[in-house]
Amino acid sequence: MIIPVRCFTCGRPLGHLYPIFKRRVLAGERPGEVLDSLGVYRYCCRRTLLSHVEWIDDVLAYERRS
């Protein structure tokens, strides 16, 4: 839902890489090559970035209002 700040497994900071990763993948680059060029080689960190889904806008539609 919210961009992961750190890898869930090893704790490496990843939050600063996600906007770059997303922009380049949407521009048509292959995700694996983008991660390699960003220096993300551990499979746990790659998983964290590759599997992230932005659902925050969908979840906010169900926000309770007092």
UniProtKB/Swiss-Prot annotation:
SUPFAM superfamilies: RNA polymerase subunit RPB10 (SSF46924). Keywords: Cytoplasm, DNA-directed RNA polymerase, Metal-binding, Nucleotidyltransferase, Transcription, Transferase, Zinc. One of its GO terms (cellular component) is DNA-directed RNA polymerase complex. It is found in: Cytoplasm. Binds 1 zinc ion. GO terms for biological process: DNA-templated transcription. InterPro entries: RNA_pol_su_RPB10, RNA_pol_suN_Zn-BS, RPABC5/Rpb10. Its main location: cytoplasm. Its EC number is 2.7.7.6. Its cofactor is Zn(2+). Disulfide bonds: none annotated. It catalyses: RNA(n) + a ribonucleoside 5'-triphosphate = RNA(n+1) + diphosphate. Zn(2+) binds at C7, C10, C44, C45. One of its GO terms (molecular function) is DNA-directed RNA polymerase activity. DNA-dependent RNA polymerase (RNAP) catalyzes the transcription of DNA into RNA using the four ribonucleoside triphosphates as substrates. Belongs to the archaeal Rpo10/eukaryotic RPB10 RNA polymerase subunit family. PANTHER family: DNA-DIRECTED RNA POLYMERASES I, II, AND III SUBUNIT RPABC5, DNA-DIRECTED RNA POLYMERASES I, II, AND III SUBUNIT RPABC5 FAMILY MEMBER. Part of the RNA polymerase complex. This is DNA-directed RNA polymerase subunit Rpo10.
